[in-house]
Amino acid sequence: MTWAKVAHNAGNGTDHVDCDSCNAYTGDTACTTALPVLCYKSDGSPVPAGLTPDFYNGWQPGHISLTLPVQGTLLTSLAAANQICVNSFGTGYGIASFSHSLGGWSWWSYGDVSSSQRFWTYISSTSGNCWN
């Protein structure tokens, strides 16, 4: 399953990442496609002033980054996907999830990732991952 960056708030350094017409149930991109992995590291960051999280636009308290593009076929499990993030950014990073503490589909976090292409994410409740 892939997501996209839909907004950046330069005032507080946050990105809004979103399903943006993804298929959360069966995936939306051929696993032979090479795309960056959206990686996330939780650090307990408070919600920035002016941002009001809700079910569809949550807050992930941490930072996001993108790996170099990898074929989805390398995402053979959640552990394999997490390891790609660790190898790229260090301990504590893992592949970003569809869900957040209030719900899913879309969330904000600190970062400024590229908006030029979609990126791999994962979902725990359906078969939308390349390893399913």
Regions found by a protein language model. Give the residues of each.
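Secreted/extracellular ectodomain signature
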Residues: 1-132
